[in-house]
């Protein structure tokens, strides 16, 4: 069996949803394993896919709920529940014809109802009523949606989505969008069965398999916090002949033991393994597996750091008085200070903690989306954005937005931007050094190393008399409660 497997090397970031869905839609492969076993890093806090777009939720939902369209392995949009669609001449109305006979199932595999056009109307209404964090992508696109979300209208029938009949769903847009179909692949646009939604009430979408319905290639069989997530192939799936993996088991991995991934792979417990060039067993693994170690292509997902410019909670902080809190807030609201931080971050060193020196540049991205994400006339998004950057000052002239190289890091530019910021901030009574709290999960070895790398590059570029990065190590739950899973702004 081992000879049939491949190790995934230092340049890869695995997403269970994308990997498993790709397996489910792959071409026939007689050697493909019938069970896929690997790891996951974060429990989903909710399965209410219409309302949350968190990756921990999306990783699950991508394998269990189908929408109108999906992407093939090349990124092309292809039919899923919509077997055909058309666009009006003015580009404002998109009409999708649904497959007949596609069913909703419970987590136990019991047939619940047929998937119908009204389910897509219900899904969008549930997203709007639940103030979904994915609405920003849609509210200016779909006619009447922004007014409904803001409360200007309380009549959802004025929103540009309707079930023409049981198998035809229609969307009306505010203006033509040539890229509209890419939006229907988002979780906010997935169908929801109204009867089931109402029957579950507040329990709908809680992180238990029975809280949602399934129409996709897999059924979620178990979800045990910080332990395991298990799926089984949906035997009644409309496209079951193209689902090649029968069962999936993902075991929780907290990042504390890098060597455990390759150990489990070697022992046959995992189907694949993420390798860390900084781990103690990397060289011996290279000798054993040789050319079976590969770098994956850079994926479309972007990971980025953000700053909290309106912090309200200080339950976890290194700050010792109110003056430090006020000074930090003023600094983060200052454009030149933020630019100084941007230029001071050594991205190559940061990613090398994960991928080693050889693979560090393979995952560097210099813009929020890939530079060639969209074409506008003869130019890519990256080319257009790069031309616009120059208008922000000469410091951006030599910054390239292509992937694979850190073109932003420059201690010299950081110092220039910081000097401007310091003058502006001192005029407001801000005191230095500015203290920046950065929370990190204490058991995640790589995350701690990356955060320390960030601290080193910023402090060496700007000077500790000016900026101090305070690394706050804490548990996974503590970190999530003040960041991505904070329930209200006052907790952040």
Map each language-model feature to its residues:
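Periplasmic binding protein-like
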Residues: 38, 263-267, 292, 457-492
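N-terminal lobe/hinge region of extracytoplasmic solute-binding protein
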Residues: 39-89, 213
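Surface-exposed binding/hinge segments that line
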Residues: 97, 119, 126-196
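Extracellular/periplasmic solute-recognition and catalytic clefts
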Residues: 221-235, 251-320, 348, 352-357
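Append "and occasionally in soluble cytosolic enzymes with long acidic Gly/Pro-rich linkers
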Residues: 332-460
């Amino acid at each position: 069996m081992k000879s049939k497997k491949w190790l995934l090397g230092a340049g890869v970031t695995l997403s269970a949803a994308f990997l498993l869905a790709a397996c489910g839609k792959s071409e026939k492969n007689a050697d493909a394993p019938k069970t896929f076993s690997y790891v996951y890093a974060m429990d989903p806090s909710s399965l209410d896919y219409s309302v949350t777009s968190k990756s921990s939720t999306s990783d699950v939902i991508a394998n269990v709920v189908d929408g109108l369209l999906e992407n093939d392995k090349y990124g092309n949009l292809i039919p899923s529940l919509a077997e055909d669609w058309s666009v009006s001449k003015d580009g404002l109305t998109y009409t999708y014809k649904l497959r007949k006979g596609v069913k909703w199932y419970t987590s136990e595999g019991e047939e619940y109802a047929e998937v119908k056009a009204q389910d897509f109307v219900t899904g969008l209404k549930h997203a709007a009523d639940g103030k979904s964090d994915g609405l920003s992508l849609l509210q200016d696109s779909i006619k009447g949606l922004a007014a409904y979300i803001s409360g200007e209208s309380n009549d959802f029938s004025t929103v540009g989505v309707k079930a023409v009949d049981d198998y035809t769903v229609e969307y009306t847009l505010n203006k033509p969008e040539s890229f509209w179909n890419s939006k229907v692949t988002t979780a906010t646009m997935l169908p929801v069965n109204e009867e089931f939604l109402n029957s579950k009430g507040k329990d709908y979408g809680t992180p238990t398999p029975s809280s949602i319905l399934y129409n996709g290639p897999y059924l979620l069989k178990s979800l045990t916090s910080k332990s395991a997530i298990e799926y089984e192939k949906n035997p009644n799936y409309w496209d079951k002949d193209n689902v090649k993996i029968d069962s999936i088991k993902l075991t929780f991995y907290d990042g504390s033991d890098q060597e455990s991934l390759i150990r489990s792979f070697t022992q046959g417990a995992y189907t694949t393994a993420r390798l860390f060039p900084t781990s103690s067993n990397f060289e011996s693994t290279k000798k054993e597996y040789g050319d079976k170690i590969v770098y994956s292509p850079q994926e479309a997902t972007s990971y980025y750091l953000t700053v909290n410019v309106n912090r309200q909670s200080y339950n976890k902080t290194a700050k010792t008085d109110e003056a430090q809190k006020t000074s930090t807030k003023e600094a983060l609201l200052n454009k030149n200070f933020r630019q100084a931080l941007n230029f001071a971050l050594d991205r190559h060193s940061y990613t090398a903690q994960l991928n080693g020196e050889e693979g560090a540049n393979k995952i560097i991205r210099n813009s929020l989306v890939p530079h060639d994400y969209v074409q506008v006339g003869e130019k890519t998004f990256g080319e257009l954005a790069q031309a616009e950057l120059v208008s922000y000052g000469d410091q951006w002239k030599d910054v390239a937005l292509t992937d694979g190289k850190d073109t932003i890091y420059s201690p010299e530019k950081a110092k220039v931007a910081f000097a401007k910021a310091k003058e502006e901030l001192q005029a407001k009574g801000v005191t230095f050094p500015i203290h920046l709290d950065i929370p990190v999960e204490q058991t995640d070895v790589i995350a701690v190393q990356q955060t320390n790398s960030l601290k080193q590059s910023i402090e060496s570029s700007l000077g500790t008399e000016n900026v101090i990065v305070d690394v706050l190590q804490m548990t996974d739950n503590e970190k999530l409660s003040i960041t991505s899973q904070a329930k209200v702004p006052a907790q952040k």
